[in-house]
Amino acid sequence: MTIALGKFTKDQNDLFDIMDDWLRRDRFVFVGWSGLLLFPCAYFAVGGWFTGTTFVTSWYTHGLASSYLEGCNFLTAAVSTPANSLAHSLLLLWGPEAQGDLTRWCQLGGLWTFVALHGAFGLIGFMLRQFELARSVQLRPYNAIAFSGPIAVFVSVFLIYPLGQSGWFFAPSFGVAAIFRFILFFQGFHNWTLNPFHMMGVAGVLGAALLCAIHGATVENTLFEDGDGANTFRAFNPTQAEETYSMVTANRFWSQIFGVAFSNKRWLHFFMLFVPVTGLWMSALGVVGLALNLRAYDFVSQEIRAAEDPEFETFYTKNILLNEGIRAWMATQDQPHENLIFPEEVLPRGNAL
């Protein structure tokens, strides 16, 4: 029996190796394999949004003006969702709705699906970029894991929620005032502020802001080695090996303030990661529930008592009446194609309004 010993050599001109060498080359802006997804999708999403807010009307989908060309400003311009009659169509430019006509495609709301889908894949590409770079420089992938929070929120709000409803029409349009209108819609039709998943999301985001402020201030407060620079940002070499702040001093300070303090830097920073990301994940789960029209808290006993006793009212019952007012106004304004006419008995009543 003959045993051949040797090293298998690949063809030096292998296409994969050539692409890998070019994509992962050290340059000012890293490209990488993830860049093949990130850069085109981000370019099309941002470009589609600028195009829509500049030129494209929402008259045919919402009966609204939504572009700079029509007189809107940065806060009121938007790329609006397609009409409710188009349901969940992808609205491809070459599809049966637009039939290759770019003007008709814009009028039907094709830019919204274009921006939403390219935006989602662009965000995923950015997360993959963080994975790829972390692996290249031998870091842990916690940055990419943390970025899954914003991705979960974007996908749940802009894609999963309208998929659970009758069409893309019920997703948020891409604009500042349009997002505010969507928030009011969520409150009126889903009582979103009383949803425990929303509460966890608020606690996560605001708690993270508090932790960030406390952490930054504490590190600044416990600096023990000043440099020659004019300010903090110029005083230290970013590649210095030794720390220049005191964890022991910080621990002593917060132990006196609260009675407890972080004694371990890993646990401290993991907690700062855990709080906002978990909050975002929880709020995304809540939106998925709303896509299925799941209800959260309904304090029916208070509603019944408020209906029977004119002198009994709580902040909850007042909010329920406000929600009814939002629904009564929004349903007729936002869905004129439904020809909704509300009888007097279902319109808002009582002293809450």
UniProtKB/Swiss-Prot annotation:
* Name of this protein: Photosystem II D2 protein
Which GO cellular component terms are attached?
A: chloroplast thylakoid membrane; photosystem II
Q: Name one Pfam family in it.
A: Photo_RC
In terms of Gene3D superfamilies, this protein maps to: Photosystem II protein D1-like
Give the organism the record lists: Pisum sativum
* Oligomer and partners: PSII is composed of 1 copy each of membrane proteins PsbA, PsbB, PsbC, PsbD, PsbE, PsbF, PsbH, PsbI, PsbJ, PsbK, PsbL, PsbM, PsbT, PsbX, PsbY, PsbZ, Psb30/Ycf12, at least 3 peripheral proteins of the oxygen-evolving complex and a large number of cofactors. It forms dimeric complexes.
Residues that bind pheophytin a: Q130, N143
Segments traversing the membrane: 41-61, 125-141, 153-166, 208-228, 279-295
Q: Which residues carry this modification: Phosphothreonine?
A: T2
**Which UniProt key words apply to this protein?**
Acetylation, Chlorophyll, Chloroplast, Chromophore, Electron transport, Iron, Magnesium, Membrane, Metal-binding, Oxidoreductase, Phosphoprotein, Photosynthesis, Photosystem II, Plastid, Thylakoid, Transmembrane, Transmembrane helix, Transport
Q: How does it sit in the membrane?
A: Multi-pass membrane protein
Binding residues for a plastoquinone: H215, F262
Q: Which residues carry this modification: N-acetylthreonine?
A: T2
Q: Which InterPro entries match?
A: D1/D2, Photo_II_D1/D2_sf, Photo_RC_L/M, Photo_RC_L/M_CS, PSII_PsbD/D2
The free-text note explaining how the cofactor binds reads:
The D1/D2 heterodimer binds P680, chlorophylls that are the primary electron donor of PSII, and subsequent electron acceptors. It shares a non-heme iron and each subunit binds pheophytin, quinone, additional chlorophylls, carotenoids and lipids. There is also a Cl(-1) ion associated with D1 and D2, which is required for oxygen evolution. The PSII complex binds additional chlorophylls, carotenoids and specific lipids.
